């Protein structure tokens, strides 16, 4: 009863998606006071830094790039083991960008112990002969996305709940994610519905999908284009919220 009264003391509730709007109504908010205004994250319009992107391109030297972004402890081991099983069939550079900087050295050791050759972004050396490039830099994620042919969003093979898929979507990148994406449930569902993303259940299926995409350039391009189209279609939340606020004032 208390939350019912509190919600209805508000002039209006602007939610970021329909699921949230429905929950407010279930909690007792009057239907005419709840509006789905959209998610302001879509209005950020993320872009990569040109100089940083150029520097990373100099390292990758035009190779096919598969980026595993914002990975967590336990995920890299799964990814490396599954990669080793199909390594001879994939002519691509694997890029790891761990979520937490304190794990850079740990991920390097994992790769080396698996017999993989590795270069670090910080060395600025060419990765033409390397199996793995370690993204041991801060604030450069958009540039890693920019040079990627395929992006896997980490935090989704463990119980973290996934990470922001909108950034690679804004850059027209094909996006793959694991089974656990509860932090981005609606966005991941929309990406799947729009044929703008692929969900896998484990790292073995992840590399099955990667090989399928690399052997099917049309599907690869279509996934990226659909991701960008979805991102663009969701923009405008800031303007909608501003108009709502002005109407109330």
Predicted regions and their residues:
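Nucleotide-activated sugar donor-binding and catalytic core shared by glycosyltransferases
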Residues: 1-249
């Amino acid at each position: 009863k208390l939350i019912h009264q509190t919600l209805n003391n508000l002039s209006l509730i602007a939610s970021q998606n329909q699921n949230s709007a429905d929950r407010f109504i279930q909690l007792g908010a009057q239907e005419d006071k709840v509006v789905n205004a959209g998610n302001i994250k879509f209005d950020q319009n993320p872009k990569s830094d040109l100089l940083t992107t150029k520097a990373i391109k100099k390292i990758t030297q035009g190779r096919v790039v598969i980026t595993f972004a914002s990975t967590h402890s336990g995920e890299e081991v799964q990814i490396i083991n599954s990669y080793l099983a199909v390594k001879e069939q994939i002519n691509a550079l694997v890029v790891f960008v761990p979520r937490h900087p304190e794990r850079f050295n740990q991920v390097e050791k994992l790769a080396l112990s698996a017999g993989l050759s590795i270069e670090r972004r910080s060395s600025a050396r060419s990765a033409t002969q390397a199996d793995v490039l370690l993204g041991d830099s801060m604030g450069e994620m958009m540039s890693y996305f920019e040079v990627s042919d395929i992006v896997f969003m980490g935090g989704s093979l463990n119980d973290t709940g996934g990470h922001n898929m909108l950034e690679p979507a804004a850059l027209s990148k094909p996006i793959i994610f694991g089974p656990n994406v509860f932090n981005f449930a609606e966005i991941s569902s929309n990406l799947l519905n729009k044929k703008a993303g692929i969900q896998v259940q484990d790292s073995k299926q992840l590399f099955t999908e990667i090989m399928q995409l690399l052997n099917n350039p049309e599907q690869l391009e279509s996934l990226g284009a659909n991701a960008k189209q979805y991102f663009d279609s969701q923009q405008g939340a800031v303007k909608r919220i501003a108009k709502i606020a002005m109407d109330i004032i």
